[in-house]
Amino acid sequence: MSSPNAILHELLNLDEIMLTNGAEVSRVEETLNRMGHAYGASQMNVFAITSSIVVTMVFPEGEEYTQTRRITTPAGTDFFKLEQANALSRQCCATPLSLTDLKDEINKISKIKPAPYTIYLGSMLGAGGFSVFFGGTILDGAIAVIFAFLLCFLQRHLNSICSNTFILQFFCSLFIGTGICITAFFFPVIHVDKVMIGDIMLLIPGILMTNSIRDILIGDTISGIMRLVESLLWAGALACGFMCAIWFVGGVL
């Protein structure tokens, strides 16, 4: 029989993937509960928040195994990876995998990364569409598309350098906002506000805020408040970045 500690370690690996890719806290706890029982536990005590998971497996013989996982990976949204993690959890609940197979499957899921072109294409289409949707012209949408490409490029290459999400978002919004304002100075025909709105929509933590409200409503108050505060600080960093860009360009040019 595989070591319960080793199994618990892999279960935490799977739940960390779920928590950092858009899963609700209640879903993370439920997954650990179900998988723990599938692997022979008679009782599962699980406590999860956005930054930590604590779980105790109690077996029929009276043995207890407890592990804690500190979540340091910034929260993101990857529904494909989340779907794969959910599918694996259902498979294990129906027919538990061996420790080796479980570890291999989790490693495969953790290595899944979206193709860069899909991120660039989606961001460009989204920024251009939102810019036109909020009243901009086709030219405004085209400018928003260009800066959406630059925004994705910045995020992709600065993410490994800057581990602080708020600072990263601030500098990205500052750079993009400055670029848009300078472009509008030389090409007065474009509408700065419409172009900015299109690119801001790529940065707003909408899913994070939605999940925070959902967590609060279903009783996960601590997790909900943590996510809500994080999303508000994130939005504040974006607002400060674009505000500084407008102030800087307006003062210099």
Label the model's feature ranges.
Residues 105-108, 151-162, 210-223:
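C-terminal ends of transmembrane helices
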Residues 20, 37-41, 90, 94, ...:
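Generic secondary-structure signature for well-ordered alpha-helical cores
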Residues 185-253:
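Generic detector of multi-pass transmembrane helix bundles and their immediately adjacent loops
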Residues 74-127, 131-140, 230-239, 250:
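Alpha-helical transmembrane segments and their cytosolic membrane-interface
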Residues 113-186:
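Core alpha-helical transmembrane segments of integral membrane proteins
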Residues 1-97:
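Soluble N-terminal domains of membrane-associated systems
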